[in-house]
Amino acid sequence: MEGENWRVAPGGALHGEARVPGDKSISHRAVMLGALADGTTRITGMLEGADVLATIDVFRALGVAIEGPEQGAVTVHGVGWEGLRPPARELDVGNSGTSMRLLAGLLAGLPFDTVLTGDASLNRRPMRRVTEPLAEMGARITTSDAGTAPLRIHGGSPLAGIDYTLPVASAQVKSALLLAGMRAEGHTCVTEPAPTRDHTERMLQGFGYPVSRDLATVCLEGGRRLYGTGVDVPADISSAAFLLVAASIAPGSDLTLRHVGWNPTRTGVVEILRRMGADIEVLSTDEVGGEPVADLRVRSAALRGIAIPEELVPLAIDEFPALFIAAACAEGETQLTGAAELRVKESDRIAVMAEGLQTLGVTVEPREDGVRIVGQPVLGGGRVHSHTDHRIAMAFAVAALRAEAPVEIEACENVRTSFPGFVELLRRLGMGVEVDGPHDRGTA
């Protein structure tokens, strides 16, 4: 992929209102369950990013007819489990860790062989955390010697339900086991050490599949059916996080974000920002298809450093690049622990964010499972590298609001995986962003 670099002008404020793209986690799951359902599923508000498009491409390769996307609308003509067909090629999910881990569980119970692969970044990420519990259910999946993709899934093995306790809180692993559990004999129960996003459980019930929860354990019984339905995807709070931080740190900002996913397993970023002193107001709430949504108003505020409670870490795991920028602009010191998972995301987010913040003149002390950041009133400018991580690129774009010189960001092309139109939205809300690369083809 041709590289794309950004140059973001220093200073400014954000005004107006916006609806960020649809939630990536919910978009993936809606396509997957729609394909496995009996009947037709109509999805609106879907994220048209590269990751979700990769999931759509996988199911087309498995014989599912899917219309769209067109302006966030997709129609999935479900074929049931029995209607899936052997693909004629490897199933390439690009940069999408969600696709790979959830599909590993979904494909494990099929009667034919499949191969899951991704781009160079994804094929370096750890996959044993999902293949090992699937093997306990009877799945036969081979990885590289390092435990990474490609995943070769040998079909035809009968699966049996298990009781499994996650060693590390992971919604992706939980979801993979529940998807495999639908094809398994008996009950599959997954116990979490800490709460994680529960979109899979909510959506299974929305498609008519019974799921039970008792405290930290979620269970389902194999052999039930899914039924096509309508899914209205809320705006992605992980994408909204960049704008919540941006409006918080830029003096004079006043921004309203519409129809943001307000699932309580995803609102850790708002809780952390509020503890730092952010002015975030819930204007209204609603529930759409079993998922809570909210309109949020955020105004600039003087942030202060805090020790981030470890119990909030799994509820904000994807939002820490944005939160690191908030910490860099806060008065005092912010401490993060219990977040070793950040080292095995699309990049080593602890190391890469620390490197970039140090380039901007911030005092940062990276640790094995977290970081110490000393905030300052004004950031320096400079050139940082995103390491092709979409959330790193967007975080440093936001940092320019408190910089004294332009911030240049290398390798921003993967922002299209989660937030197509990010640059255009920043410009509309009042920021100055220049792009060098393929952005003019409408892919950023």
UniProtKB/Swiss-Prot annotation:
Do you know which CDD domains this protein is assigned to? EPSP_synthase
> In which pathway does this enzyme or protein participate?
Metabolic intermediate biosynthesis; chorismate biosynthesis; chorismate from D-erythrose 4-phosphate and phosphoenolpyruvate: step 6/7
Q: Which sites bind phosphoenolpyruvate? A: K24, G97, R125, Q172, R349, R391
A biological process term (GO) from this entry = aromatic amino acid family biosynthetic process
Q: Does the keyword Zinc-finger apply?
A: no
- Positions contributing to 3-phosphoshikimate binding: K24, S25, R29, S170, Q172, D318, K345
Q: Where is this protein localized, as stated in its record?
A: Cytoplasm
The active site of this protein is located at D318
- Known catalytic reactions: 3-phosphoshikimate + phosphoenolpyruvate = 5-O-(1-carboxyvinyl)-3-phosphoshikimate + phosphate
According to the UniProt entry, its GO molecular function terms are: 3-phosphoshikimate 1-carboxyvinyltransferase activity
The Gene Ontology CC terms held by the record are: cytoplasm
Q: Which UniProt keywords apply?
A: Amino-acid biosynthesis, Aromatic amino acid biosynthesis, Cytoplasm, Transferase
Q: What is its EC number?
A: 2.5.1.19
User: Main subcellular localization, coarse class?
Assistant: cytoplasm
Keyword match Calcium: no
Cross-referenced InterPro entries: Enolpyruvate_Tfrase_dom, Enolpyruvate_Tfrase_sf, EPSP_synthase, EPSP_synthase_CS, RNA3'P_cycl/enolpyr_Trfase_a/b
Give the top-level enzyme category: transferase
Q: How does it assemble?
A: Monomer.
| Membership in a protein family | Belongs to the EPSP synthase family.
Task: Name the NCBIfam families for this protein.
Answer: aroA
The record's function comment reads: Catalyzes the transfer of the enolpyruvyl moiety of phosphoenolpyruvate (PEP) to the 5-hydroxyl of shikimate-3-phosphate (S3P) to produce enolpyruvyl shikimate-3-phosphate and inorganic phosphate.
Q: State the name under which the record lists this protein.
A: 3-phosphoshikimate 1-carboxyvinyltransferase
